[in-house]
């Protein structure tokens, strides 16, 4: 293969305030599962940088769970589709697909023999279904709740019991198979968010928005106690997870804490305070082997430390909204990837280990549209919040003084030498020097979309929606229109100079990449055809001979300058999502980012 995936830095869980987030464990204890958009993300619990992504759902996926055998995963989406797929092969072949009801699937449970499956959620005519995994034949009826069912679990020992938790403040208890409704437990005074049997089936825990956790006998459904007396948490409880030996219970709450409960003593033995910000609310949790995980409203996954409850020993960070732009810094001998997302977050990643973090302080408040490095430890970014920011890469801290307010919304930014920066805004081109606006061109007869600066000559190329590249030159503190335009094949979406400055590559909305020769007075060198939809981004390899382009067709092409027919096609680079930006780490390693909020690295080999 001329290309292969080298690393996947996965997205965070997609979270919503006031809604429980399920992170599910692996029966073998190696991985954990969660969802974001149309993707199911499988991550290694020991080393979260190892990740696998499943993207075969046509709609947003809500929940995914391993079968107890470990060989299959069932995942459910907002349309009510349930897909059961193979975990043993990279292709994740589909085994079965069902539509138990029309509406959002909110939770899934398997029997311990991996033969029966229960699915609950927001159906139109019913809120749940339980059936054989291989034929879809019904093995009972889920009744007893009169509102949306949020949670379901099946006792993992015989005789089987099934329980559901609903927005009608009740849990429904079933015996089977075939599963028959026995009674409702109406102890909660608010929505029931989570119901879970202990591993040996002796106990059942239910957690609700009233801040209470009730324990029941797993076999009979009789109430045993309320954990912590009248209140287990000061806020709603979104998730509970049993310890492997069933003696303790982990709970996650909107009061920004997680707690470990000693079930026999009916008391909290450890309380983890995870912050004071609203984004520190805890929406999900998982106890697997010796690991205790919780999910914050920020999307961060916390590895809780029993010995130091005040501070998680690891926090998985990243993006959970679409990534719009990226750049790579190779200055200190190792590669750092910078990414900016739709919600204004900027992350920096160690390209080797996947360790990442965000800048401290208050940064952009809206989509980060474009970014570039100035070669002296500064990242320059522009955003839909109408600002241009200079962020110091050594302190990694946003400073309010380093923000430049624009008259209109900026779209793209490019850095030249000598402290010059050019940004294109809606109907405007702005020149900045040493963090100050020094010149602007307002009366344009075209809409500027993208910009690149030739590092040697200071020529500024501005790509327009009129299908042309307009050339300007920096002269002192002003921009001079050179009166020359280059014809692209459609509205320009991105442009980039080769590292040696000899060529300019231009992508356009008509799926073409056009390369112009700088030395020949910007004459057209060649055109490169292959994309099936609008091309979005272009980046040159350090070897000056190859360049990569990405598009809305989910594809990445690696082109050869001297021969348009010699190309490497990477279909489904980010399946079901636009590939929004790319950058080269070295001559054989390409990094791509996408609306799936993931960062991928590819090893590209040339013949």
Swiss-Prot record:
Domain of life: Eukaryota
GO cellular-component term (any): cortical actin cytoskeleton
An example molecular function term from Gene Ontology annotations: actin filament binding
Pfam families in alphabetical order: WD40
Keyword terms of this UniProt record: Actin-binding, Cell membrane, Cytoplasm, Cytoskeleton, Membrane, Nucleus, Repeat, WD repeat
Coiled coil: none
Example GO biological process: actin filament fragmentation
Annotated localization: Cell membrane; Cytoplasm, Cytoskeleton; Nucleus
Record carries keyword Glycoprotein: no
SUPFAM superfamilies documented for this protein: Nitrous oxide reductase, N-terminal domain, WD40 repeat-like
Main function: Induces disassembly of actin filaments in conjunction with ADF/cofilin family proteins. Doesn't sever actin filaments alone, but caps the barbed ends of filaments severed by cofilin, which blocks annealing and depolymerization and allows more extensive severing by cofilin.
Protein name, as recorded: WD repeat-containing protein 1-B
Organism: Xenopus laevis
Gene that encodes the chain: wdr1-b
